[in-house]
Amino acid sequence: MKRISSDEVKKVAELARLELNENEIHQHAEQLEKILEYIKQLEKINTENIACTTRAIEVVNVLRKDERRDYENSDELLDLAPSRENKFFKVPKIINE
């Protein structure tokens, strides 16, 4: 199996915005090699007669109908907020223009 180079680990770390020292780069290279070896083992499994699925168990949502309800004590809730403006919560800006 082809070994994963330090440069490849550095590139992946850069893309993931991770700062790794040389020891961590070596550790991650070994871990990635083990993961790829495991994937190679999985590729050998015959799945020809296995039906495609997206999950192991079926997921069913039990939903209720959306109903608009006025809350009579909205001022009481707004008073709990660190900051408010009229009838709205005031939150810090998180998106730069």
From Swiss-Prot:
Answer yes or no on keyword Metal-binding: no
Question: What highest taxon heads this organism's lineage?
Answer: Bacteria
**Pfam families attached to this UniProt entry:** GatC
Q: What are its E.C. numbers? A: 6.3.5.-
User: Per UniProt, what is one GO molecular function of this protein?
Assistant: ATP binding
- Protein biosynthesis found in the keyword field: yes
Q: Which GO terms describe its biological process?
A: glutaminyl-tRNAGln biosynthesis via transamidation; regulation of translational fidelity; translation
Keywords tagged on the record: ATP-binding, Ligase, Nucleotide-binding, Protein biosynthesis
What Gene3D superfamilies has UniProt attached to this entry?
A: Glu-tRNAGln amidotransferase C subunit, N-terminal domain
Give the top-level enzyme category: ligase
Record's catalysed reaction(s): L-glutamyl-tRNA(Gln) + L-glutamine + ATP + H2O = L-glutaminyl-tRNA(Gln) + L-glutamate + ADP + phosphate + H(+); L-aspartyl-tRNA(Asn) + L-glutamine + ATP + H2O = L-asparaginyl-tRNA(Asn) + L-glutamate + ADP + phosphate + 2 H(+)
Q: Which residues form the signal peptide?
A: none
Q: How does it assemble?
A: Heterotrimer of A, B and C subunits.
Q: Which family does it belong to?
A: Belongs to the GatC family.
Q: What does this protein do?
A: Allows the formation of correctly charged Asn-tRNA(Asn) or Gln-tRNA(Gln) through the transamidation of misacylated Asp-tRNA(Asn) or Glu-tRNA(Gln) in organisms which lack either or both of asparaginyl-tRNA or glutaminyl-tRNA synthetases. The reaction takes place in the presence of glutamine and ATP through an activated phospho-Asp-tRNA(Asn) or phospho-Glu-tRNA(Gln).
Q: What is this protein called?
A: Aspartyl/glutamyl-tRNA(Asn/Gln) amidotransferase subunit C
Taxonomic source organism = Prochlorococcus marinus (strain MIT 9515)
